[in-house]
């Protein structure tokens, strides 16, 4: 299921230059979305920081280059807010993607790898369309087989931000 969810991760929506950026962080927040964009919060990891990664093409893949402030977060306990993208059936999830923007299409990933975090939680988190707050140990990934840049292990759902 993860492979299916990530099949479009490297393909971001092409937004005409005249359309202003809506929301913060990577990805595209559809202005017709019933969900408000995430707001920066003190003590919560910024999607703007996570999206400051750059990539270079090597062989048939994109290899991330993380700035020092992002590398410094590797194996640190962080809090991050985002929108759940379940990877398994059921209303409670232990393994899901957290996105910087809400999904607006059931077949597409709303952001690239810089706007997604794979999350593994100790206790199940109830799926919701509203933003959630998660705390756990962040892994900064430079060579993930699925092309992910970030993962939270040992996470715990903290409810709504």
Predicted feature descriptions by range:
Residues 13-161:
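OB-fold and OB-like single-stranded nucleic-acid-recognition modules
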Residues 1-9:
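Bacterial N-terminal signal peptides
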């Amino acid at each position: 299921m993860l492979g299916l969810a990530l099949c479009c991760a490297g393909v971001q929506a092409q937004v005409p230059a005249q359309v202003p950026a809506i929301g913060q962080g990577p990805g595209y927040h559809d202005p017709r979305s019933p969900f408000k964009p995430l707001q920066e919060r003190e003590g919560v990891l910024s999607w703007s920081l996570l999206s400051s990664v750059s990539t270079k093409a090597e062989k048939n893949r994109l290899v991330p280059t993380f700035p020092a402030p992002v590398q410094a977060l590797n194996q640190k306990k962080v809090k991050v807010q985002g929108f759940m993208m379940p990877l398994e059936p059921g209303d409670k999830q232990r393994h899901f993607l957290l996105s910087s923007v809400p999904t607006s299409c059931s077949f597409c990933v709303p952001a690239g790898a810089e706007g997604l975090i794979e999350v593994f939680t100790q206790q199940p988190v109830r799926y919701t369309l509203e933003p959630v707050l998660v705390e756990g140990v962040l892994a900064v990934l430079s060579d993930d087989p699925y092309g992910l840049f970030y993962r939270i292990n040992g996470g715990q759902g903290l409810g709504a931000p």
